[in-house]
């Protein structure tokens, strides 16, 4: 995905466009973030640090995923006042998270002028069966996935950007790698299939046939795909780009580290120069202590990625 041509948008009527905002417009807005880093922030000061480091957008939160894991309880949409304060402090786009299936939280976020909504498994799901109908909103939505079928189901619902779910708040990139390799592996298989095999494959992965065929023709997802969940170092970020992602979300990895400003700049540089080992070595030096990671082999660790299908 990284380093390929312009991301195609739907032109064949595959997705129903609402009067609120055509899907192609939302896909175009998401595409503007391609090649960038989106950073979680919990206050205006952190937002300014992220912007100065070169982030293409920030995610406004009350608690970063590492704190959500540590503190437990029910994680909900952030206070709209905090989101407004963060939005007023920067000139780059601001995202915010809504609970899976909680369309009223999404309505509130749209009403306060947020730029993108992340329907996120990091927050406690509000609906175990249904995701938000994202076609009912003007603003673009981001959704997570673990595999190609999940990605295409979210796109059918109106997601304009897909990210790996990974395991946010762990500082451990293994699940993000697993998820992007799963998506990319299925796309490689799909590209080599005869057209008459696509029906069976679409049924197997429980994805809409027209989107599966479009993915086959494009050789990639029809929307931008970012990496998320456990990215903590410049090397992690470059790894995800080399695996084919269009950009990177960084959550706890920046502001839970020893020198957030320096690490933020380094990760932005790593995403920009992801294929240059000399540059990656340079930006990886002297960053201070990385966030404390979590071993995902521990069965007691809650898997956020399993909260939805």
Swiss-Prot record:
Family, as annotated: Belongs to the PdxS/SNZ family.
Note: Vitamin B6 is an essential quencher of singlet oxygen in plants, that can protect cellular membranes from lipid peroxidation.
Induction: By stress treatment with salicylic acid and ethephon.
Catalytic activity: aldehydo-D-ribose 5-phosphate + D-glyceraldehyde 3-phosphate + L-glutamine = pyridoxal 5'-phosphate + L-glutamate + phosphate + 3 H2O + H(+)
Role description: Catalyzes the formation of pyridoxal 5'-phosphate from ribose 5-phosphate (RBP), glyceraldehyde 3-phosphate (G3P) and ammonia. The ammonia is provided by PDX2. Can also use ribulose 5-phosphate and dihydroxyacetone phosphate as substrates, resulting from enzyme-catalyzed isomerization of RBP and G3P, respectively. Also plays an indirect role in resistance to singlet oxygen-generating photosensitizers.
Gene Ontology molecular functions: pyridoxal 5'-phosphate synthase (glutamine hydrolysing) activity
Full protein name: Probable pyridoxal 5'-phosphate synthase subunit PDX1
Entry's EC annotation: 4.3.3.6
Annotated GO biological process: amino acid metabolic process; pyridoxal phosphate biosynthetic process; pyridoxine biosynthetic process
List of catalytic residues: 97 (schiff-base intermediate with d-ribose 5-phosphate)
Enzyme class: lyase
Name of the gene encoding the protein in the UniProt record: PDX1
S-S bridge residues: none
Residues noted as binding D-glyceraldehyde 3-phosphate in the record, renumbered to the chain: 181
Key words of the record: Lyase, Pyridoxal phosphate, Schiff base, Stress response
UniProt-annotated binding residues for D-ribose 5-phosphate: 40, 169, 230, 251-252
SUPFAM superfamilies named among the record's database cross-references: Ribulose-phoshate binding barrel
Pathway: Cofactor biosynthesis; pyridoxal 5'-phosphate biosynthesis
Signal peptide, first to last residue: none
Species: Hevea brasiliensis (Para rubber tree)
Segments crossing the lipid bilayer: none
């Amino acid at each position: 995905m990284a380093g390929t041509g312009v991301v195609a948008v739907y032109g064949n009527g595959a997705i129903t466009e609402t009067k609120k905002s055509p899907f192609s417009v939302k896909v175009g807005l998401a595409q503007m973030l391609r090649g960038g880093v989106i950073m979680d922030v919990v206050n205006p000061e952190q937002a300014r640090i992220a912007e100065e480091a070169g982030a293409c957008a920030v995610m406004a939160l009350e608690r970063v995923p590492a704190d959500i894991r540590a503190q437990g309880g029910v994680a909900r949409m952030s206070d709209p006042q905090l989101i407004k304060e963060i939005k007023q402090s920067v000139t780059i786009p601001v995202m915010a998270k809504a609970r899976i299936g909680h369309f009223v939280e999404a309505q509130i976020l749209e009403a306060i002028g947020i730029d993108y909504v992340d329907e996120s498994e990091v927050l406690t799901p509000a609906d175990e069966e249904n995701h938000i109908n994202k076609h009912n909103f003007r603003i673009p939505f981001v959704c997570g996935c673990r595999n190609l079928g999940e990605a295409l189901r979210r796109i059918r619902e109106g997601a304009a950007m897909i990210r790996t779910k990974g395991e946010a708040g762990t500082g451990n990139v293994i699940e993000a790698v697993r998820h992007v390799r799963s998506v990319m592996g299925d796309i490689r298989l799909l590209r080599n299939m005869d057209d008459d095999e696509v029906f069976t494959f679409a049924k197997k992965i429980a994805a809409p046939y027209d989107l599966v065929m479009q993915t086959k023709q494009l050789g990639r997802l029809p929307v931008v795909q970012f990496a998320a969940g456990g990215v903590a170092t410049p090397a992690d970020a470059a790894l995800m780009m080399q695996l084919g992602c269009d950009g990177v979300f960084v959550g706890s990895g920046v502001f839970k580290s020893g020198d957030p400003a320096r690490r933020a700049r380094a990760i932005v540089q790593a995403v920009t120069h992801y294929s240059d080992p000399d540059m990656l070595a340079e930006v990886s030096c002297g960053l201070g202590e990385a966030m404390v990671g979590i071993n995902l082999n521990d069965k007691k660790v809650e898997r956020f990625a399993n909260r939805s299908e």
